[in-house]
Curated annotation (Swiss-Prot):
Gene3D superfamilies, per the entry: BRCT domain (3.40.50.10190), DNA ligase, ATP-dependent, N-terminal domain (1.10.3260.10), DNA ligase/mRNA capping enzyme (3.30.470.30), Nucleic acid-binding proteins (2.40.50.140)
GO biological-process terms attached to the record: DNA biosynthetic process; DNA recombination; double-strand break repair via classical nonhomologous end joining; double-strand break repair via nonhomologous end joining; nucleotide-excision repair, DNA gap filling
Protein name according to UniProt: DNA ligase 4
Species this protein is from: Phaeosphaeria nodorum (strain SN15 / ATCC MYA-4574 / FGSC 10173) (Glume blotch fungus)
Residues that, per the record, bind Mg(2+) 2: 496
Catalytic activity, reaction form: ATP + (deoxyribonucleotide)n-3'-hydroxyl + 5'-phospho-(deoxyribonucleotide)m = (deoxyribonucleotide)n+m + AMP + diphosphate
Function: DNA ligase involved in DNA non-homologous end joining (NHEJ); required for double-strand break (DSB) repair.
InterPro entries: Adenylation_DNA_ligase_IV, BRCT_dom, BRCT_dom_sf, DNA_ligase_ATP-dep, DNA_ligase_ATP-dep_C, DNA_ligase_ATP-dep_cent, DNA_ligase_ATP-dep_CS, DNA_ligase_ATP-dep_N
Lineage: Eukaryota, Fungi, Dikarya, Ascomycota, Pezizomycotina
UniProt-annotated binding residues for ATP: 324, 326-327, 331, 394, 436, 496, 501, 518, 520
Class of enzymatic activity (EC top level): ligase
Keywords: ATP-binding, DNA damage, DNA recombination, DNA repair, Ligase, Magnesium, Metal-binding, Nucleotide-binding, Nucleus, Repeat
Length: 990
């Protein structure tokens, strides 16, 4: 006899109706969805049983090692923090299953509210909630408590406790509510009732209606419960556990399903039984269901192009890889279904990488009211046989007037403008969807197929609609030497970099692996000029920087010639916001010069002398917390990576990655940069960039690649060399001309004069300029400006000096044999190699770098070759740099931590006879290693970013590489003390 199925009690039925209504559509969509058997627990159990224990575990961390502690029911555990957190979550979920039922969705959407796509955004940020609470508690908006909430980033003025909550809005609200709470004990409002009220709150727009919902909460909650409710509304939980942990504990396949659907409700309702696993097509993505796309991995810090290509898993049968330009836009997926009832016959869906629905902007239909900024123009984009399709790509902004991509910051503005374009005008800026993958076609899931097959499907199903929807082009490459020319091209065009792809790879949802690799130029030429700009606004920090200005709004003067009384006197346009590179002394100096002169920014009455972004639309983008008259302010000297367009600032341009250099105490406010002066600087910098090639390094150590003369010189076996062997004074170079541009650096140093003498002694002719004569050998071992200029021309190979030595030595070894010129080896002999010669010269050595024509006499070189023959160990190891880059990619950068502050540096230390300086240098080296940097003793090593010199060694600084900054140990110490990377020029040689 089968067991009786337990039926939901009356309270459970009431709560189910309260949260989901009598929704037949839900039952049809989720026919097997679970229903709880009993009432959900009180809201406060979320923080008493889950949030607080998790945060307490976070604070404690792992217990220090010591005597073995007692284990068992009455002893202490020695679990790691991660294990302890999992235990807490497992207990909470097990308790829910036992006492409530299998529908965990009501709790899950409160635990990870930022992943809940079913509930609309509340439209409530900190200040809006503060205004609601002021009305709720019926306190004066001019009272101290009201000001504490409205100015939550400011240090507390009411009592000492307020100072500790500067930057913590929910904590500040607790202080205000705790003295006015209707309930001192924990309330009885259930999780289901809270969800019902939050659903209503998300549908309301007016402040008065929002106050009524908050009154309902306040009547049944105490101050602590209200504090957690506010965190849920703001979607700022910070409880010490990620959504991945919760999903993994809920069900083994929960993360997989979330990756293909981005639907928390579906995860909870379809995977309520841990014993029932996803199978087959259930693990694949679906039409009109947002999925988590595949991501590109970050290149290894210090990895060469050769190593990057090796990670793309090329093999002897297929050594190809694809090179694509990395686009500066927003990752977007397009879903299309044929629908006879939709205007135009097709239904569209657009989702960002963060699962935000953009169909309202880019369009749901081809025609009618819901034809958006893109769909109205792509009627002919799909083949006649395409019934449905899912495309993966990048939404970018394209400027039709210059026919070029525009920075990401302009995308939404361009889309809104294009939405109103009814005539298909070919001017201005517009959204352009660049498609690089097809993951679903005509009811067929394509993710298991190779990228090459998916590309064929894409090209057969989609046709370009010029500057609306285009298939993103790629270059098929076969050697790592093809990467640098492509990278140089995109750098010259101010692009973001490259993406390298393995055409043999399948599509992996929500995975960042080596099948797609980003390659970015880390050390590009900076904007080139320091900018002295006036400070007009200040922003209060949060967390440990709460209560004081942590960043500043800088502006450009409109008219430096204006006099007091003129309309333009002191008038400024906002330009950029800077918060990096300040030390405690810098903050103190700025505070000392401006204290008492700051005014709170009133959005209803903004100062007329300061215009912000959005001014013409009566908006206030990047609004500061406080402002200051330019005549009372200070001038900051700042540098940046580049200038880019942005409607967030009044000037419509801003600095990318600005950093503070120094406080210009020698400049008056009216000597700060004006709008016209900046235009002149910008034009000058752009002119210089056209004249001089951008210098860059690839992450930590870009591999120098070698090339030789376009016209082949005499090679092994040539009958033109008939002179018999004559020892060191041979005629091996007879008939060749040598243009030696630099000294030799590797494997030993030789001066330019010594090299020229060696060439002459062996029959060669020395010239002092390049030409197109067929037997000219150009020699260099350093990338000087004249060498870089020759590379840019791309007409001649450039040979390393070691080839001269190798050729002479080989002919000494072959005493008595017919003398011959040693064939070029790409890695050892070539400094710059023309693409046309690549395959020919690669044939001169095997895969491990062992030459077919040259004897290996050097032990270290032999050891290196033998080491390369060892098969790589198949192992999975933690990639720290990739992990940190992913955190930054998700907006959770660790750049404020000391263990990350030097992560992008490689530092060379000079030696000194001064024992005191040597000790300081050792300590500085330890700081750099702890901060994630690399240490080297060779200043000429690839990728060196900083050179630390002893005090007084300024005379020899000229030999430091162009891209290496010269500093003293004082810079390292100061960065360490301030927990931030400071500007190098302030701490040179000390």
């Amino acid at each position: 006899m089968a067991e009786d199925t337990e039926m939901p009690d009356a309270e459970a039925v009431r709560e189910n109706t309260l949260m989901y209504g009598h929704d037949d559509e839900l039952d049809e969509k989720f026919p097997t969805r679970p229903m709880n058997l009993h009432k959900s627990p009180p809201f406060h159990t979320l923080f008493t049983d889950l949030f607080d224990p998790l945060m307490e575990t976070q604070k404690k961390g792992r217990q220090p090692p010591g005597p073995r502690r007692k284990a068992g029911p009455h002893g202490h555990s020695n679990l790691s923090p991660h294990e302890a957190k999992r235990n807490i979550i497992e207990r909470f979920i097990a308790s829910w299953r036992k006492t409530v039922g299998n529908d965990f969705y009501p709790a899950m959407r409160l635990i990870i509210p930022d992943k809940d796509r079913d509930r609309a955004m509340y439209g409530l940020k900190e200040k809006a909630i503060a205004k609601v609470l002021i009305k709720l508690t019926k306190i004066s908006k001019d009272s101290d408590d009201a000001k504490q909430m409205l100015n939550w980033k400011l240090p507390g003025q009411l009592h000492k406790a307020s100072a500790s909550t500067a930057g913590d809005f929910a904590g500040r609200c607790y202080q205000v509510l705790s003295s006015r709470q209707l309930n001192t004990k924990l309330g009885d409002m259930s999780i289901a009732e809270v969800n019902n009220a939050l659903d209503k709150l998300s549908q309301l727009g007016s402040e008065d209606e929002q106050v009524k919902i908050f009154q309902r909460f306040n009547r049944r909650m105490n101050a602590e419960e209200m504090t957690w409710l506010i965190r849920i509304i703001l979607r700022q939980m910070k409880i010490g556990a990620t959504e991945k942990t919760f999903l993994d504990i809920w069900h083994p396949d929960a993360e997989t399903l979330f990756n293909i659907s981005s639907n928390l409700r579906r995860v909870c309702w379809e995977l309520y039984d841990p014993k029932v696993r996803l199978e087959g097509e259930d693990t694949g993505l679906s039409l009109m269901q947002c999925f988590q796309p595949q991501l590109a991995a970050f290149q290894d810090k210090g990895g060469s192009f050769e190593k990057i290509v090796a990670r793309l898993q090329a093999n002897s049968d297929d050594d190809s890889f694809w090179i694509e330009e990395k686009l500066d836009g927003e990752r977007m997926q397009l879903h299309m279904i044929e629908d006879p009832e939709a205007p135009g016959g097709k239904l569209f869906g657009f989702w960002s990488r963060k699962a935000k629905d953009y169909a309202y902007l880019y369009g749901k239909h081809l025609q009618g009211d819901e034809a958006g900024a893109l769909t109205r123009f792509i009627t002919d984009a799909f083949g006649k046989n395409v019934r449905n399709i899912i495309l993966d790509g990048e939404m970018i902004t394209w400027d039709m007037d210059v026919d070029h991509i525009v920075g990401f910051g302009t995308l939404k503005t361009a889309a809104i403008s294009e939405k109103e374009n009814k005539t298909d005008k070919s001017t201005g800026q517009r959204p352009l969807f660049r498609v690089f993958d097809c993951v679903y076609l005509n009811d067929k899931l394509l993710t298991p197929y190779t990228l090459r097959d998916r590309r064929r499907a894409l090209e057969s199903a989609v046709k370009d609609v010029k500057r609306r929807l285009e298939i993103h082009p790629y270059i098929e490459a076969h050697s790592h030497t093809e990467i640098e020319p492509a990278l140089r091209k995109v750098v010259a065009e101010s692009s973001e970099g490259l993406v390298l792809k393995n055409p043999r790879s399948m599509y992996r949802l929500n995975d960042r692996n080596a099948d797609w690799m980003k390659v970015k130029p880390e050390y590009m030429s900076e904007f080139g000029e320091s900018l002295d700009c006036i400070v007009v606004g200040g922003y209060f920090g949060s967390g440990h920087r709460g209560g004081a200005h942590s960043s500043f709004l800088c502006a450009l003067l409109l008219n430096k010639d204006a006099k007091p009384g003129d309309a333009d006197y002191e008038k400024c346009w906002s330009f950029f916001k800077v918060g990096g590179g300040f030390s405690r002394e810098d903050y103190a100096a700025i505070r000392g010069r401006t204290e008492g002169k700051w005014k709170d920014w009133d959005p209803r009455r903004p100062p007329p002398i300061i215009e912000l972004g959005g001014h013409e639309q009566n908006r206030q983008h990047e609004r500061p917390d406080q402002w200051i008259h330019p005549s009372d302010s200070v001038v900051l000297e700042c540098k940046a990576a580049s200038v880019e367009g942005s409607d967030k600032f009044r000037f419509n341009l801003t600095l990318r990655f600005p950093r503070f250099r120094m406080l210009r105490t020698d400049k008056r406010w009216d000597q700060a940069l004006s709008r016209e002066e900046f235009y002149e600087i910008k034009a000058n910098v752009e002119y210089k960039r056209e004249e001089k090639e951008k210098e860059f390094e690839i992450e930590k150590s870009r591999r120098k690649r070698t090339r030789t003369t376009k016209k082949p010189i005499v090679v092994a076996g040539s009958e033109t060399i008939t002179t018999p062997y004559a020892g060191p004074q041979s005629k091996i170079f007879d008939g060749l001309s040598f243009y030696i541009m630099t000294e030799q650096l590797h494997p030993t140093k030789k001066s330019k004069v010594d090299l020229e003498a060696l060439v002459k002694a062996n029959g060669g002719r020395v010239v002092q300029r390049d030409s197109m004569e067929p037997n000219l050998v150009i020699v260099a071992d350093k990338r000087l400006i004249k060498v870089a200029s020759l590379e840019k021309r791309d007409t001649n190979n450039i040979v390393k000096p070691v080839w001269i030595q190798d050729t002479i030595q080989q002919n000494e070894v072959d005493n008595g044999a017919l003398p011959y010129l040693l064939p070029f080896e790409p890695n050892r002999h070539m400094f710059y190699l023309l693409g046309d010669n690549q395959l020919d010269y690669e044939a001169n050595a095997d895969d491990y770098g062992d030459s077919y024509a040259r004897d290996i006499a050097d032990v270290e070189e032999m050891r290196k070759i033998l080491g390369a023959t060892d098969p790589p160990q198949k192992r999975t190891k933690f990639d720290r740099e990739s992990f940190l880059d992913q955190l930054e990619d998700h907006g959770d950068s660790l750049s404020h931590l000391k263990t990350y502050m030097f992560s992008s540096t490689k530092v060379a230390f000079r030696t000194s006879d001064d024992p005191v300086w040597t000790l300081r240098a050792q300590l500085a080296g330890n700081y750099i290693r702890f901060g994630g940097g690399q240490i080297t003793e060779d200043e000429d090593e690839e990728g060196v970013t900083h050179t630390v010199v002893p005090d007084g060694q300024t005379a020899s600084v000229s030999r430091v590489a162009d891209l290496s900054r010269v500093v003293g140990v004082g810079w390292v110490q100061k960065c360490w003390d301030e927990s931030t990377r400071l500007d190098e020029e302030r701490y040179q040689w000390g």
